[in-house]
Amino acid sequence: MAGASPIALILGSGPRVGSSIAKSLAEKGYQIVVTSRHGTGAKTPEGYLSYKADFSKPESIPSVFDAIKSELKASPSVVVYNAAAATTPPNQDSVLSLPLDNFNSDLNVNTVSPYVAAQQAVLGWETLPADTKKSFIYTGNILNISILPVPFVLTLGTGKAASAFWLGLSDATYAAKGFRFFYADERNEDGTPVGNNIDGPAHGKFYAQLAGHEQDIPWHATFVKGKGYVEFK
């Protein structure tokens, strides 16, 4: 729709990171669509469209994009994947004791559903004006490059590492069309992982920069609160 505000879709809108990203993008003029297991199909108090989504079922993802096109008459130019899953192996002394069903379910959330979302994003981007900034942003962590000896991160790390690869490959092959893909990873100033001390507003500010293609930030977008993009080697 000519003249309409761009649309940002946040898949996995939690109370800390997801809500901060939504707020930051809304302040940039985006129409916001949020999804979670508790989506209502109506508008939130903030004025965001809210849809229900089960990220353990990748086949359900296209219906979210269809609903957006039906309601807003356009496709999202920014898609943020902020959902994650981690199941602890029942035997802490055997990381491979996790049942296959649990492994598959978590892999769906961490890798397969975001892949399907990226497919849908690209299909939608092809219909948008050429000068519209188009970005797919995945909330990552250090597990794509660092193996921590903690059984709890088995499925989380597997999913992050797998997703980082296809995100990097997608960015390399679609960038010429103006389609950007980012693996966003908040770090401490010394490059160590922030762990559970993630900062919602810092994510919101940085994701808004990524959405607008500000600076020449690579697909592996490591960032520090108060500084923005910082490269760590």
Q: Where in the sequence are the language-model features?
A:
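C-terminal helical subdomain
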Residues: 168, 172, 176-233
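Structural signature of the Rossmann-like NAD(P)-dependent dehydrogenase/reductase core
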Residues: 10-11, 81-82, 132-141, 180-185
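Conserved Rossmann-fold cofactor-binding substructure of NAD(P)-dependent oxidoreductases
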Residues: 56-75
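Catalytic loop of short-chain dehydrogenase/reductase
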Residues: 85, 94-119, 126-172, 191-192
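N-terminal Rossmann NAD(P)H-binding glycine-rich loop of SDR-like oxidoreductase domains
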Residues: 11-24
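Conserved NAD(P)H cofactor-binding loop of Rossmann-fold oxidoreductase domains
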Residues: 80-92
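Conserved glycine-rich Rossmann-like NAD(P)H-binding loop of the short-chain dehydrogenase/reductase
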Residues: 28-43
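Rossmann-fold cofactor-recognition segment
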Residues: 45-60
